[in-house]
A protein has these predicted regions:
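Juxtadomain coupling helices with adjacent low-complexity linkers
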Residues: 163-203
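A structural signal for short coil/turn segments at secondary-structure junctions
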Residues: 58, 145-146
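Well-ordered, non-membrane alpha-helical segments in soluble/globular domains
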Residues: 43-50, 107-111, 186
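Intrinsically disordered, low-complexity terminal regulatory regions
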Residues: 4-98, 202-203
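A short, aliphatic-rich beta-strand micro-motif
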Residues: 149-157
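Regulatory sensory and allosteric helical modules in signal-transduction proteins
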Residues: 83-145
């Protein structure tokens, strides 16, 4: 176990830097009780606090995290159906929640967007109404949720580098983030990915 811990520390340091490492260590160093429900709530609150801070810093209307999961099997085969659900969300006062709209969604419905994120590690859409901007099949979802700009990044496992989900911020009006703001989103997303990776492996 000690060796595994050393490997994790080395990986986290390489991927998210010393600042990210200190953050993860601080959050995970809290003693856990034998009450798994209480532990789960406390860990979820850490994530909610983090995404709330990101949303406020970037003045976004909404921030969300989606995670991949299995969702049953196809009728005549044992092949599992890959799905995703929004598992965390924070919204500005007066903005509607979308978490209930994106539960058990087949990944195949958003293949183009997910392929773009897996290849580039992010997807920037500053204006859904701009025909020159590639929206990767997300325009209908944007219209349904009143979104006019989205900045999404992939969340990658700190050990395997496999995509475990996505994090995105939405705006009701078109929005062009600066490179500094994009870098901030990517850095904080990497930090959250590290936390989620360890969190999922500890369950």
């Amino acid at each position: 176990m000690e060796l595994i811990g050393m490997v994790l520390v080395a990986v986290i340091t390489a991927l998210v830097g010393p600042a990210g490492l200190e953050y993860v260590k601080a959050k995970l160093s809290k003693s856990t009780s034998k009450d798994i429900v209480k532990d789960d709530i406390e860990r979820n609150l850490v994530i909610f606090d983090e995404i709330s801070e990101i949303r406020e810093t970037l003045n976004a209307d909404r921030i969300w995290i989606s995670q991949f999961h299995n969702g049953g099997h196809f009728l005549h085969t044992n092949k599992s159906i890959q799905k995703f659900s929004i598992t965390y969300e924070d919204v500005k006062p007066g903005i509607g929640s979308i978490i209930h709209l994106f539960t058990d969604i087949p990944l195949s419905l958003y293949s183009r967007a997910m392929n773009h994120i897996m290849e580039n590690r992010y997807l920037w859409i500053p204006d859904f109404k701009d025909e020159t901007v590639a929206t990767c099949g997300l325009k209908s979802a944007a219209e349904a949720t009143g979104t006019n700009a989205t900045y999404a990044i992939g969340l990658f496992d700190i050990v395997t580098d496999k995509c475990i989900g996505t994090m995105g911020i939405d705006y009701r009006t078109k929005k062009k983030l600066t490179q500094v703001q994009k870098d901030f989103l990517i850095e904080r997303g990497s930090r959250l990915a590290g936390y989620l990776s360890i969190y999922l492996k500890s369950k």
